[in-house]
Amino acid sequence: MIEVRNIHYSVGPLKLIENVSFDVQPGELLAIIGANGAGKSTLLKLLCKEIAPTEGKIYLREQPIETYKLDVLAKFRAVLAQINTLSVSFKVHELVMMGRYPHFVNKPGEEDVQIVKTVMEETGITGFANRDYNTLSGGEQQRVQLARVIAQIYGQPKGLLFLDEPTNGLDLLYQQQILSLARGLANRGYCVVSILHDINFASRYADKVMILKKGKRIAFGVPREVVTSENIHEAFNIQVRLFHDEEFKCPLVIPSMALSEQTTIK
């Protein structure tokens, strides 16, 4: 469980996060959306203990985040960063095993080896287990990185997974694969928090959506309550039309005018 209570974060006079509160329960996927500069990445850094709030409290599994030592935190909290480039070569299975490093001292045990095998099967990367990571496509690399962070918290009761724009730069197929895996983890009891740029993906896959604007929470709740034309206009300064998908029971967003109708390009 994640509990955020009235957090603020400032750098000098600049207020990056202002009075944000929310909860994420085990089994929920929270999507954080907002325009560029809204404070999404800053908020995620606060949740990951990369930076500390200026004011307010963050609780992970009912314990103040500042009381956790990093080695303890690493056993049940995993983070998929936005950029995952490697300057050295690793086999895919070696990289996934890195997710188990917090759980052993010298060498992996049988449980670690089995977890890596299971996670690679679940994420569909077994076929290139012995490939050099740097020879993979962007979508394949992202699946490997997701497998690594899943392996890190695999089997941990109420594990926490933070994803920073996991679909960035991927084609439609890989975007759906990544978010389907994230959705599956939430269904198994994990708390999943993801920054997303695609409002429709947020609406389709998330249990809850939070919209940020200039570091402030302007909406939080289930997609059908949060993904409204009014909220989208306030956050992104664009007029949209909403359609309700009968199969998935979620709103879908389409810009109400083409770019050529809204903006004159010279």
Language model: regions and residue ranges:
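Conserved ABC ATPase "signature" region
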Residues: 111-128, 150
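Catalytic Walker B motif of ABC-type/P-loop ATPase nucleotide-binding domains
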Residues: 161-165
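ABC ATPase nucleotide-binding domains
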Residues: 235-266
